[in-house]
Every structure is written in C-alpha cells, then in structure tokens.
C-alpha cells in the first residue's frame, strides 16, 4: 500500500474511492492544494484564538456580503450555537445554564413540511422544536399564529425552490419573524451554488448556517453569517468563550484547530472567486471517461445528467434489471477491491437511497440505476471505477 495510506493499513483499514461526494460518513471533503498549504502555514505559528476568530469572521462576512461571520465546527455546530445565542444572548448566567433553559424563551418554530434529518440540531442546546402546519403544507397565518411568549426564533430549512406552495417562503417567514421581534435561523448547509444564490442566502436571514466541507474546507468546519447583533451572541457560546469572562459556554465541545479556521476561510474565498464552469468541466470529463468504458457492457447504458446539487452533474448508470439490480451493483462496488462507494447508505447495511435526492445520487423508485459523483474522485481513480464495474457485470 502507498506511503500515505500506511497507517490505514496498520489499523487494518481499507481506504475507499468516494464516488458519492461530500458525505460525512466517508470523510467529508478534499481540500485543494492552496487550502492545505494555508493550513500547514497556520500550524507553524500559534495565535490568540479570539483575535483569529474576530478577523476571520470579518473576512468571511466581507466575502459573503453579510454584517458579521464566525467559523464553527460544522453546520450542525453553527445551528446549535445559533439557537444557544438566541436563548442566552451574552448573559453569563444564562450561558452557563444551557442546555437547561429555565427562565428563558426556548421554543423554535419549524414548518412541518421542512422537517429534515438534521433538524435535531435546533434542539441540542436545550431548545424545544415546535412543528407548525401539516406535513404537506404550512400557511403564513399558521406560522404567525404559532408565535407565543416562549418563541425565541423561527428555523428555516433553505431549499432552491423556496418550498413553492408547500411552506411559507423565506422572505415571508423573515417578515413574520421581524414583525414579532424574533430572529430567523436559516439552515443552508449545502446551498452554495450558484454563487449569487449563496450570497442571497447569506445576506437575508438573521443567522445563516453553512457546512464548509461542501466548498472544499476541512471536513469538521462550517460558518455562520448574519446580523452582527446575533453573530455576537453566537460567539458568546463558543469554545473559546468558555474561558472568557467566566461564561462556561456549552460550545466548549465544539472545538476547532487554528489550521481548520484558516482552511475554512481560504476555501470559502476560493469558492466564491473560482470559475465554476471549469470545475464542472473537470467532473464531466471524469464522468465521460467512465461512461465510455462501460457503455459497451451488455445491459448497461450511461450518461452525464444534471442533478439539483452544487456539483450539478453526475454519471447516471442504467442497468438492465435482468442483468443485475442497481443495489446489488452498489453493494458489490462497496465491498470489493478497491472499495468504491457510489451512494450514501439509507441505513448501515444499504449503499443506495430510494430516490434521486438533493445529495444527487441513489436509485430511482421503479427504475434501476445509480449515480456516480466524481467531485471527490481523483484522476487515477477514474479507471478503477470503470474497470471494477466491468469486472462485476462481466461475471
């Protein structure tokens, strides 16, 4: 095994080829050479962390056109600290009390159509998530009527279609929040492309939470941007705030290295300034290379297709069900040599989802295909994927 993988081997582990994308369960992200170099340079010197967070917060706010910003240990931490900030503010006694919320407003409203896998993060600092509306619809009247004396904020799960007729739009939700003197916390983890769309997301809510792994930052980093009044409250909950002014903040467990902070900022700057058409071209070329190699397999056809994600394109591999199920192919790829992951597991024993989701990969109900994402696939791994598919389907 090659040198950089030697310790995986020592531990008895087999590295994977990640043809899924920026998934936490597979390691998250592949920082660019410039990001890695900036992180290595940061490692050479110690820094006053409070000063680092202040300056990097100002920098990311400028990049995204927001009033203020803060680097966190992922989007989940950004949400958790945002809620904590809305409840406890900068009051040292309240900060030290969380996640107990006695005497604090602690209800977060979330429209029921927007319930999603990670909305648990809105409760981790002690808040109570209150559903509004039905599973398929929530109206402005219902959202407004749900606000009471214990409501501390409205949560909003950002999606490109702005929820159309299913839920209250973010613009209307923000108006309702402000009319009632409460903030809106937007979960926009992977809503980072097109860039104008990312900037729009960053600039409209009171607190907006992004996962930095999606734009090539270290896996365990994220950012929160928004109104300075609220970002200052987020800072007061952070891991360094635990040692400042006797706050004993709950964010102590959400620690970041100085290198990760720098990596997140450099990656963000690259993301907002890069030519994304070049990024797409690189991935399309990889996908077309795989397609050219597998399209001559009986019962297989493939094509580059658009997906509703920041990566925009993936390779759709159609398989004749009489030859093999897409799930079986995904399982054999995941458990062979090399190990190739082509879809996130819906459960620990599955390697595909039941639909093409916002993650951009899976098996469509009633059809038999899988999607290959090449954003985290190296040039040398492209042929390994096509060769392995040919090997499996030629048995």
Please tell me what each predicted stretch does:
Residues 3-30, 57-71, 76-271, 295, ...:
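Conserved PLP-enzyme active-site core in the AAT-like
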